[in-house]
């Protein structure tokens, strides 16, 4: 329950970290190339990044490290964890590819993951995400293979 509570704001935390880390490429482009060519979103993100300090960024990394530690502790009880890859089927069209909340949380903690196309929602594929632990990629793939065999005998 502690880990689940800790990742409730994974999207916001990941976005803030990415905003800081994306500052320099955007800054370089805006300064040396064509700032007007940046999208409104990129300009807003750059302004947000410029308003952040190294101390804020360090605090974000500390928060991420604490979440990673909570996840690592799960290895004492579990060989892998599972979640959906998304909250539902991908929407139709190309305007939006769907909610990445579940995959963002996995990326935030930096763990290896495999998505198995074994479920359906509204007749469309819905992935089952199997998440492993640091340096346990072979174990993760073994569990993913076993699950794939169960869903598709």
Where are these regions (language model features)?
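Structural helix-boundary/capping segments
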Residues: 58, 108-153
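Short helix-loop capping/hinge segments that flank enzyme active sites or metal/cofactor-binding pockets
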Residues: 13-68, 117-127
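Short, surface-exposed loop/helix-turn segments at secondary-structure junctions
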Residues: 59, 85-104
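Short glycine/threonine-rich loop-to-helix capping motif typified by GTGT followed
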Residues: 10-19, 92-97
